[in-house]
Amino acid sequence: IISLITLCLGLSIQAQSNAELVSSTVVKSDIESHIYFLASDELKGRQTGSDELKIAAAYLANHLRKYGVKPAGENGSFYHNVPLETVSAPSNISLKLNDITGAQFLGVSVKNIDYDGEAVFLDFGSKEDFEKVDVKGKLVITKAGNPESTNMMSKLMAGRAKRELAKSFGVAGLIELIEVEQNMWERFAHYFNEGQTGLKNPEKTEKFVHIYMGDPAMTNAVSMANAKSITANLKVEGIETKEFSSRNVVGYLEGTDPKLKDEFIIYSAHYDHVGIGKPNAENDSIYNGARDNAIGTATVLSAAENLAKYPTKRSSLFILFTGEEKGLLGSKYYAENPVMPLNKMVYCFNSDNGGYNDTSKVTIFGLHRTTVA
């Protein structure tokens, strides 16, 4: 943290040594207090959408205001509201293919559906496989992944492209038969059974049905490949959608150079974490998120405090993102709905998962692409 703050301040007061900068501008106890508060049990792991994350957002906004940072959010506030929705996991998935009944399912993309009709088996489901038969409006069954997939993870990773391919052919849904690696299966089942949070879908477009069915020895895949025809009954039920909003926290300081102050350097971090989960060996179920990412958040607060005292030629934009642990949601929404023109951003210092052993290095990516230095 100290190294990053020193680097940031070095842009404006390069004449001072690093040691002088640290001793004159950084108060260790202040940084510690930010981290201890944000990572406290009282904030319950700062889950996106929780009341505790709202408390964290207010804490950040109040400190930016205290330092003299100007609000850059909505209606003169420090808040940049991010519209979100959580789609619950289904209460039930049942699937019957001819006389085969599935027992293990991962619903990676699902909607409530009751399908009775024809299914088609397409081996691994390559584009050539889809082009061989009429699949429109039918349920498509494939082996998971592609011929190059060697484990469950690689098979799941290949599924996204296959899902988009299936959608382009107008199929009713995609079922992939997958050999179960129990540890990996439990890991993904836990993730998908919690429901999925994403940016609010303003068009209310229906989700495409994409489900993995456990097939331990791939015997079902063999049966499907040998079947002359396949009748399918797929039922997915109990899915509910909850809409809510969460907050990015944004503020800015104006630069000192008349020619450069219209350009911005961003100092950012995400301030959310994963909330409450499975207890550890000490029966502690709160995932406090000190390293991920109370430390990074404290870095931005400290940079804001000091840059308010020692402003740079370019303007400074401070962004604390929500929803990172849910899939970079706050930063994605900000990129699509910026408070300042993106073409005026010349560099971004983002701090995430700091506090590891080596405190002597700060790595800068893309320095050759900017005029910030």
Where are these regions (language model features)?
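Metal-dependent peptidase/peptidase-like ectodomains
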Residues: H210-I211, T219, T312, F321-A373
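Structural recognition of the beta-strand scaffold that forms the well-ordered cores
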Residues: Y36-A39, F121, L139-K143, A172-L177, ...
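Second-shell loop/turn segments in exported
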Residues: N18-T25, E42-D51, N81, L106-S109, ...
